[in-house]
Amino acid sequence: MELNEKIKRIGGRPSVLPTEFVEALVAFKMNYWKIDDMRLGFDCYDPNDEKNEKRIEIKYSTGRMDYSSFAPKIEWGILNFVKFYNESPIECYFEVYDIGIDMIFEETEKFGRSVYEGYGRRPRISISRELIERGIYRNKKEFSLF
C-alpha cells in the first residue's frame, strides 16, 4: 500500500514531504553531495560517477500519480525519481530510480512532446506512468527510511 493511500484510509490528507528533506535523504543514502544553491539548476552531485553525469535532479512521489515539470534550462544528466511506500506500521521504505536525461528526451519525443517549455508553460509528465511503469530506467535501489 502506498503512503498516501494509507493516510487516506485513516481519514488524513495526502502527505507532501518537504523537497529539501527528500533531497537530503537521497543524498545521504546514495552518497551524493547535497547542493543548496538553486542557481546551479540541480539538486545533488555524485563525486563517484565515472560516466561524467555527476549532476543529479531529484523528483519524488508519495502516491500513484505524479506530475513533474522541469526548468527551462536543464543543467543535470541524471534524474533520481523517488517513490515512497508504507507496507507496515513499523517500516516505511522508498525506491530510487536512476533515469538518464537522454531516456527522458527519447520517450517524451516518441509521443510528440517535449520536456522544454512550450506555449508559455512547462509541460508536465508523469514519471511513474510514462517511464517507470514501462521499464524506462537504468537502475532501481530500495531503502528503508528508518
Predicted feature residues:
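Nucleic-acid endonuclease domains
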Residues: 1-55, 59-146
